[in-house]
Structures are given as C-alpha cells and as structure tokens.
C-alpha cells in the first residue's frame, strides 16, 4: 500500500530525532550562484521556467504547481506511470543552453514566465548564458550551483525564493539525513570502498571522470573512480584498453543495453568486476538514479547504491524510497510499484 498520513508523520518524527546540521550551517554557503535581472518577490512568482534537466527535478520537487513544463522530460507516456496525472500533464518545453537550446526565446516569451531557474554547473559559461538570456528577454534568471552535498541548501534557498519554505524544509531535512548516512559510510574505515567504473551509453564506453557531477554520488560513499584525466572533471569516451588497464572491481550502469553488453560481451569478461559478477544495473525511472541528470534524483540513487553494501541502508531502502517519492515527486507508491522500481539486476 502507499504511505498513509500516520506512517508519514511517524517517519518524520523519527527523522527529526536525527543529529541534523543546524540551519545556520546550511545557509553558511549561498548556493544561488547568480541572479540576473530583478528577481520578483517570492509571493509574485507563479510561473517558472526550468532551463535544464537538474532544474526540472528541483522544481518538480519544490513547486510543481508553478512549473510551466519540463525542459527535457516527457512523462505523458508509460515512462511517467509512477507519477501523478498532474505531473504527467506537464509538457516538455525544451532546454535553454545557448546554441544547443531547444526552447527558442520567442517561445519562451509566449509562456510569460516570472522567472527562469537553472541548476547544475555554475561556471562562467553558464553564468554568461544566464545573463545573456535575461538581457534578451527581460525575464529574471537564477542560476543554482548543483553540487549533491549542497542539495539541502539548494532546497531551502530556492524554496524561499519560490515561497514554499515549509515544503522545502521537509525535503531539506530528509536530504540532510541521506547525506549524513552516506558521509558516515565513507568515513567508516570498516566499510567496503570498491574501485568502480561508471558505464554510460549503449556500449558502456562513456563515463564521468573522477570529481565530475556525473560520478559525484558514487564517490560520496568513498568509492574510488578509476577514470581519471588530470584536472578534467567531465564526461569522456574511453576504450576497452582503458578499462582493461583500470580493471575495476565494481561496474555501475543505468542503461539496460549497456548492462547486457558488459555482462555478455566476450571482451568484457576479463575485467575483474565482470568476472566476479559485480555489475550493478540501476534502471526503472524515466531519468537516472545516479546521473542523467546530475540533480537531486541522485539522493535516492545514493540510498539504493549504499543498500548494496550496507545492511542498515538495505533495511531502510523501501521506506526511504516511499518517503522520497512522497516528498520530492508528490507520489505515494503502492507495493507493486515499489517492488518493480527496486528490482535487482
């Protein structure tokens, strides 16, 4: 059955007893990296445009009633079966990303938004794009730094911006608890910290380099990313020669085709992780658990990945998943949906 009010309140009571970070600490670092144009008062913001995939999920969590549509996701079909009808009706509008934009400025203006919000990388490229878009359209643009460790602060600060502080506070509290549990696992000298390769793409030969947003969730548990390239922290293409040389003892993928290729292709069989059947597939959502996008969806992916190695996390996984969907996706999962979502490959 889904999560009823009594179960949810009981869970929150337990959650409130955890040694959470104080609010003053959470606000010590401003995760709103840039404000371009005159930002309206919170009570005046009713129509919000998401600039990209991480912002899609941030705004779905905080203010689905103000979100005009997704930049990148279409949940109207079978892929959106886990979500409410209201969420499934949100259109895919296209993303704002400079020359690669799929949402034109002309269409943007016809939507009459009060504000544009982006979340993720906040480097000079994205700041310049935000400033230019705001100047060209007259629509205020807010850029949020999207580091996973900073998710609670992102939620509180953008929640304040959108006048949804109560909802944001509950979400931030749960995010704090997930991150603290992951940090405790990482700092425990007795826990397993495998050397991992994060396989992307149909052939499994795309990956995120160590320190990138794309592998941040896995690295947060203290796992060692075998893919490194000096100071680069991006996605990259690799070869089988790279993988054979790195010889990871764990492979993680979110792509079913990649999983099939890795586990059945002869060239992968000499990789230690494959030989020892330590290839984890995390699929079942219309977006990734640990990446694609590198947004707050990674919190739940963190819970699920930790459950493979931590018996306590494994015991809490179903409860965590129900609570996450309730708080962030505004959906109460039934037992069948939960089992399907968490099926193990």
Place the predicted regions along the sequence by residue.
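Ligand-binding pocket segment of bilobal, Venus flytrap-like solute-binding proteins
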Residues: 227, 234-258
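Short helix-initiation/N-cap motifs at beta->coil->alpha
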Residues: 34, 93-105, 231-240
